[in-house]
Amino acid sequence: MSVQTSSNRPLPQANLHIATETPEADSRIRSAPRPGQDPYPTRLSEPLDLPWLNRREPVVKGEEADGPLSAAQLDTFERQGFIFEPDFLKGEELEALRHELNALLARDDFRGRDFAITEPQGNEIRSLFAVHYLSRVFSRLANDERLMGRARQILGGEPYVHQSRINYKPGFEGKGFNWHSDFETWHAEDGMPAMHAVSASIVLTDNHTFNGPLMLVPGSHRVFVPCLGETPEDHHRQSLKTQEFGVPSRQALRELIDRHGIEAPTGAAGGLLLFDCNTLHGSNANMSPDPRSNAFFVYNRRDNRCVEPYAASKRRPRFLAHEPDEAWSPDG
């Protein structure tokens, strides 16, 4: 794992902000939700008194005996909010996935569809969503017990695929993505109630420092950073290209990165990155000639299925947020 931090000095242990109610009963803005209110308020018109709120759910709900991850791996996930496993896939299995990815990205009938996201200034497909419904190859991978078992172990319950996609960042042209917490979006716009989801990203090309690898803030999963700005109508049409709403403040980012640093897992194709739904992450532009691609699956716990969105007028389309056991089709 290649590690990049914001400075070379030792990083102190975070002293998390404690979310407490303000003493004034009629306070204009509260520091924490009252009992019965949304525990993770976001897309606010005005900031809270604190830059973040404590996470309420445990990070790891299962134990070593519950799945393939070792006690050391579970401890790392608990502490950092992610783990990286090199050589999770290799050989013919990896080659078959690369071949399928290239075939899907070349589909002209996908171009212009709502589930196919192109570069902000171009026509090249950047992401294909609901890929486990578009491809039998990726459907088998999404439901592979090697992934499902890890998700079940971390979540402490039966998972289902909340979202799937393949991402492609072309050489010299692939744009970056702002810092964000996936849970903030899924809570605000999909109606995911609690932090019982985990993401699995399998790198299908070599990941190195210069081709825009995913960067994460270790330890950031332990707090929730409310974001400012009311969710625009059909926000997903813009946010999947360039996200402007649901982005933490620079103050909060500066404090969290100063305390925890930044890590960017790199390595050969076939590695698996598992990260908590609330871990802050982002990526730089691809400044190298080498493309970067990955397969991405989000596993949500079945008893945490989505309800009405907490900070949007309506839920996002189903290709972005699946229901358990649903049968989605690109043809509706």
From Swiss-Prot:
Keyword annotations: Dioxygenase, Iron, Metal-binding, Oxidoreductase
Binding site for Fe cation: 180, 182, 281
Keyword Oxidoreductase in annotation: yes
Coiled coil: none
One of the Pfam families matching this protein, by short name: PhyH
Segments of skewed composition (Polar residues): 1-10
Region (Disordered): 1-47
GO MF annotation: an example: iron ion binding
The protein's name: Ectoine dioxygenase
Origin species: Halomonas elongata (strain ATCC 33173 / DSM 2581 / NBRC 15536 / NCIMB 2198 / 1H9)
Top-level taxonomy: Bacteria, Pseudomonadati, Pseudomonadota, Gammaproteobacteria, Oceanospirillales
Gene that produces this protein: ectD
